[in-house]
């Protein structure tokens, strides 16, 4: 429940009618973002979170005020359902791709891989819906001048795919249907009762 309204989160975009994903730089201050945040808190099954780590696109992460605003929104007591609240003691904001790097470093059992990524140079690329972000790391430290963000992200690719399918077939399946097929590893979708290739 957000501001007295019931929300759902974690549902495939094509399952919701009349809903569009926000594609703007202030997404972390929106109700859909808060709904996803609350869903994550609920799924944690915890009453208290000592440290919550979240990410921002690299270009937004570079803005200290934006980082601090997100941190202050997420810290504190959150009433996530009428009978459940979760306290978040501390929030750490990182550049989005750095989270994948930290996950590999903390979870890999491959000593050779760990030696390579901790002692060498690594680039982590995060092709998201809103932005494509990349982080360059050297010996585990982020090199901010070699890291960045592009807004020519998955949303742009999906829109162009939708446009090309419409151009070829006279109808567009919609970006949600295309995205769902790609996530499922499918190379085709149904359009007008026939299979249409995504390549």
Where are these regions (language model features)?
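Nucleotide/phosphate-binding catalytic cleft detector across ATP-hydrolyzing
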Residues: 1-122, 141-155, 168, 176-199
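Short beta-strand scaffold segments in enzyme catalytic cores
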Residues: 132-136
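P-loop NTP-binding/switch modules centered on Walker-like glycine-rich loops
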Residues: 161
């Amino acid at each position: 429940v957000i501001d007295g309204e019931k929300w759902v989160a974690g549902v495939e975009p094509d399952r919701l009618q009349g809903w569009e994903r926000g594609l703007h730089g202030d997404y972390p201050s929106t109700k859909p973002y808060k709904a996803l945040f609350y869903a994550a808190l609920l799924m944690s099954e915890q009453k208290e979170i000592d440290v919550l780590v979240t990410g921002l696109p690299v270009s937004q992460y570079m803005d200290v005020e934006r980082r601090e605003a997100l941190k202050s929104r997420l810290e504190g007591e959150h009433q996530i359902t009428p009978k459940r609240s979760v306290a978040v003691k501390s929030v750490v904001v990182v550049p989005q791709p750095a989270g994948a790097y930290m996950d590999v470093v903390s979870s890999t059992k491959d000593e050779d891989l760990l030696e390579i990524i901790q002692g060498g140079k690594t680039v982590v690329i995060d092709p998201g819906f809103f932005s494509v972000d990349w982080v360059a790391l050297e010996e585990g430290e982020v090199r901010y001048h070699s890291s960045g963000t592009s807004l020519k992200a998955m949303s742009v690719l999906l829109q162009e795919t939708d446009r090309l399918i419409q151009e070829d077939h006279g109808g567009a399946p919609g970006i949600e249907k295309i995205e769902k097929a790609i996530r499922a590893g499918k190379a085709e979708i149904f359009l007008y009762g026939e299979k249409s290739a995504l390549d």
